[in-house]
Amino acid sequence: MKMYNIPTPTMAQVIMVDDPITTTEFVISALRDFFDKSLEEAKALTSSIHRDGEGVCGVYPYDIARHRAAWVRDKAKALEFPLKLLVEEIK
């Protein structure tokens, strides 16, 4: 059997930044729908983001992190929320 050298994907974290306009309900919903958080995890992370100014939603292969962040940005924009998400490569 031939062995292939498959490179390890570059990993990235999605960071959600707190703002005074985006609702708590939207943040909890986004964390549950796009980042697969349980209700309890989403509530705890939402509180942490509000308290600390930002929080890590998850760590994924870079392309998946970019897509998840884009989906949430699009949903927020459609609802006229200024939610900011960052995708930071993990080295």
From Swiss-Prot:
GO BP annotation list: protein catabolic process; proteolysis
Segments forming a coiled coil: none
Alphabetical list of SUPFAM superfamilies matching this protein: ClpS-like
InterPro entries in the record: ClpS, ClpS_core, Ribosomal_bL12_C/ClpS-like
A Pfam family that the UniProt record links to this protein: ClpS
Function recorded in the entry: Involved in the modulation of the specificity of the ClpAP-mediated ATP-dependent protein degradation.
Subunit structure and binding partners: Binds to the N-terminal domain of the chaperone ClpA.
Family: Belongs to the ClpS family.
The protein's name in its UniProt record: ATP-dependent Clp protease adapter protein ClpS
